[in-house]
Amino acid sequence: MLILNGFSSATLALITPPFLPKGGKALSQSGPDGLASITLPLPISAERGFAPALALHYSSGGGNGPFGVGWSCATMSIARRTSHGVPQYNDSDEFLGPDGEVLVQTLSTGDAPNPVTCFAYGDVSFPQSYTVTRYQPRTESSFYRLEYWVGNSNGDDFWLLHDSNGILHLLGKTAAARLSDPQAASHTAQWLVEESVTPAGEHIYYSYLAENGDNVDLNGNEAGRDRSAMRYLSKVQYGNATPAADLYLWTSATPAVQWLFTLVFDYGERGVDPQVPPAFTAQNSWLARQDPFSLYNYGFEIRLHRLCRQVLMFHHFPDELGEADTLVSRLLLEYDENPILTQLCAARTLAYEGDGYRRAPVNNMMPPPPPPPPPMMGGNSSRPKSKWAIVEESKQIQALRYYSAQGYSVINKYLRGDDYPETQAKETLLSRDYLSTNEPSDEEFKNAMSVYINDIAEGLSSLPETDHRVVYRGLKLDKPALSDVLKEYTTIGNIIIDKAFMSTSPDKAWINDTILNIYLEKGHKGRILGDVAHFKGEAEMLFPPNTKLKIESIVNCGSQDFASQLSKLRLSDDATADTNRIKRIINMRVLNS
């Protein structure tokens, strides 16, 4: 909708087109090993600032996995150390923290004994007692607190990570989020993050699928294998409608919560035709890959038969969107598959609106990342052909697209000198790589905002010029919150300089009780947002900051010329309704200099 001074009725339910906000630009090389790397973000909706921080990462030194050779999408985990040999699954084993650092047991003191026995966490009581042992990284850098919980009745074990920012992470609370020996459930090799909660009661819940024999030929070398150890990330749900201070998994293995957002990892359970939007509910059993393989570093077989075919972003706003599960974004992954080695060769982002789809513009074609050599399969082995291509928009168009979808309110309030949500502004700049910390100095924040606003303006100026000579803008001058700001619109001859981005439209449907009838001259800097716009139906023409407008005439309801001017505008077929609705017409002209 058309925006004035940051006022809008936009909500989280509105569909945001996909873009690649981070990474994906070029292969990078760092460190003495010279490994090539690249990052491809996932189509994750921003929510209220607490969304999963997931992406696809490529390393030319990486092994095979659910995304093909070299690629991974790692969630937070804690694992037993294997660099010194197969774990013994007793007190002699060492653990690796989420950052890969070796964990050591915290010293026990009289004031802080370690370990301790716990029967509850906060207000939540447990049906059994737990032995809780505190750990810390051998080399301290993150300043988090780690606790290893072991049930004294059933032996179930999990980890709690207390982050320095107050967020609590629960890893491996249920068997679904633990990678264990199928023949000895107590031999847990990895604990995967299963739930996170902020001090404000915002939650993220991670679901996993266990490997099985679906669509696998169980004859030959596949016969007799126990393939149930592997865990695949299936869903990430966040945006709980009602805040909750305690972890849901304390009291339920499957939280019955109204989630507003779900990120789905699809392994072939849904169709991959780009013309057909896939459903939220899986329709088929997952597909088997051509190059299954096994890992044995934990002392038991971890067999992998699956490839992630696509990543889907769903919104759940049934009242606003008319359906329970609305697909809004999609990352479609294409592979060069063969029995020797499978490579990810292409990635496409698609956005969905209603019954149609739109593919992100092709602005950049990437060279193929060099894969590791395939395993030797006799003398005739050859490397699979690479067809890698990544699609990405320019940083300036990304900034403009985000402004149209969510950023307009903060940016325009900031530019006009009004009160603005500073925390939200910092989170936006941090999430879009304009800041490297969420606690910048005033100078760092000011410089980051300047760069971000300049990128929006450059993205706008890169759009095609338009032949429109008249655009419209609807104001509500009688609105108390705007009366002081807009009093300059009431004097003929005034030259108004709008410090913010100014939203207009050639469509007369978006007017209020006051019409700004804006005449344009050749060479003006307004641009129709078109495909970049979030609100597609408005035909929005956006002007950059500091646009000058001169008031040429003001025609109020009841004046001699009002009926004539209103008739010329031809707002609708109902002249009486227009007269009752419209209170004044302000004729203005954009000054190009």
From Swiss-Prot:
In Salmonella spp. the spv gene cluster is encoded on a highly transmissible plasmid. It comes from the Bacteria. GO terms for molecular function: NAD+-protein-arginine ADP-ribosyltransferase activity; nucleotide binding; nucleotidyltransferase activity; toxin activity. It comes from Salmonella dublin. Disruption phenotype: A non-polar disruption of this gene is no longer virulent in mouse infection. Disulfide bonds: none annotated. Belongs to the SpvB family. Its main location: secreted. Pfam families: ADPrib_exo_Tox, SpvB. This is Mono(ADP-ribosyl)transferase SpvB. It catalyses: L-arginyl-[protein] + NAD(+) = N(omega)-(ADP-D-ribosyl)-L-arginyl-[protein] + nicotinamide + H(+). Residues 366-376 have a biased composition (Pro residues).
